[in-house]
Regions:
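Non-catalytic, usually N-terminal nucleic-acid engagement modules in DNA/RNA processing proteins
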Residues: 1-54, 58-71
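Extended two-metal-dependent nuclease catalytic cores across DNA- and RNA-processing enzymes
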Residues: 23-24, 74-201
Length: 201
């Protein structure tokens, strides 16, 4: 059966950066994260054998959420200097592998992934989103869209469908955004409603 795997490239690269030792090329360019990224991507392809594959990276630029809420993600530390040049290297690596590499300026990778997933769903494709980003769990639809978190199950990965999202969050995927808005989301610096925690939300 045809399957479309959408890889959150920025998520993959950050994870590789924190998992790999510091490495540099003969020219002094950091390469450790790219090496880890390549290993993760090759493992994904080898184990799951997707018929279609795309890797999506954040491209920077203005974000519509930050325009509406200036504090959005302002609590996050700046990208480590050693990682910055590796985004371009990772993008070039993906393209050299013959894999579709996507970026959209002024749009987060999440938004691009969500758009592609919904378009593929309408076309009858089986979609697997590869990321550890909980925000993308909102897209899970049984028989259509699943999320694969390769960090789970000691590296074996865990597939999330509607039942798994419900078990983890207590609500179905379509209501996850409401829960995060009510209780807040510290990773995005969203305050939520004072006094409202996970159970109340």
């Amino acid at each position: 059966m045809s399957s479309l795997y959408l890889v959150d490239g920025s998520n993959f690269l950050f994870r590789a950066f924190h998992a790999m030792p510091m490495m540099v090329s003969s020219k002094g360019v950091p390469t450790g994260a790219v090496r880890g990224f390549a290993s993760m991507l090759l493992r994904l392809i080898g184990e799951h054998k997707p018929t279609h594959l795309a890797v999506v990276f954040d491209a920077g630029g203005k974000d519509k959420r930050a325009e509406r809420f200036p504090a959005y993600k302002q609590n996050r530390a700046e990208c480590p200097a050693e990682l910055v040049p590796q985004f371009d290297l990772a993008s070039k690596l993906v393209s050299a592998m013959g894999v579709v590499c996507l970026q959209a300026r002024d749009a987060e990778a999440d938004d691009v992934i969500a758009t592609l997933a919904r378009q593929a769903e309408r076309s009858g494709e089986q979609v697997v989103i590869v990321s550890s980003d909980k925000d993308l769990m909102q897209l899970c639809r049984d028989g259509h869209i699943q999320l694969l978190d390769t960090m789970k199950e000691e590296g074996r990965g865990k597939l999330f469908g509607e039942a798994e999202v419900l078990e983890k969050w207590g609500v179905p995927p379509k209501q996850l955004g409401d829960v995060l808005a009510l209780m807040g989301d510290s990773s995005d610096n969203l305050p939520g409603i004072p006094g409202v925690g996970p159970k109340t939300a």
